[in-house]
């Protein structure tokens, strides 16, 4: 491998000749051999740095045109566009497990954009610190990258995936109207419900989760950029924070604003905790929905068997013909991971000692993983399972008419205690509710038929 010599304030460093990064990135690359090649800084953060560095250059060009000249801005903008496109991903090698402020990743972006920008310009006009990091600090850029990544993840990935699943459930509701089945509470038989009503509960849960995510978004759209090192805005020109937020909004198509209190923006990550709480709520509901589906599909002969789901692959290496609810299992595992991520995020967010939180990389690492897993799990579950759910009407009817909880319909006619006696007697003797009620003398057979209509109990 060929190398070139780069230098920083600590001296010279050998850097791979074919990479755009420079001395500080290389030091981090050598000093933090933790999860190398596996737990790299999320690409969502790399993209966000491309956005914010371009936005900062635009704002600096407007406020300090003698330093961020039009020529420099053009080179920086093109380099940032390449970062956002993913064309320069190989030049962002750093792992999550580095400094808690994300300083090395900020410098990684500065160095790559400067070197690529100089290549675009055909001459050395850009310096990583003096130009790309102008009016900024790692302490306000990394929180800003977190905000951008979180907003884009929720708006462009999670919510569309939620909407897709909601649409599928709406169709299933319509397709299954009028199909009455046994309800269940505590994993025990309960009074009847229509399959459409049951599905509507799933759909409404996702609609509520979407609302919670939307409630979280405005706080995520407040940017720390402009606070610089400790929130005072040292070395940033007046109005930089407002202009850079406007530029970020223009680049992303999302409405970002500058945080009203930069001291809070640097040290607190409460908006991330709150937003991830909404993701955790979504995970909890997906866990419930996936569990309902696999319970209802259990069998095929010895389980509930009230619905059928698509058969996507063989389920066992030893039991021929076995098919498992694999999509449900994937969703439930994702839910467990997201709930675990929430614990890590909450703990890390509590570590904002004095003017800066220094657990930011692990916070956004877990946040972006949750976004990615939830959105992809919902898409997979929808495509490979939910759209293919069908009701086993015969099994639903069989289970319904064998449910002892239908006795609840007799309460107005024979009273709660007599209804309970009827159910217990039927269970003990393995006879029908009608036979039990008549045997105990509570109703005649004719009166029982007159008042007992399970399909009207919904």
Model-derived regions: residue spans:
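Conserved, well-structured ligand/cofactor-binding cores
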Residues: 1-458
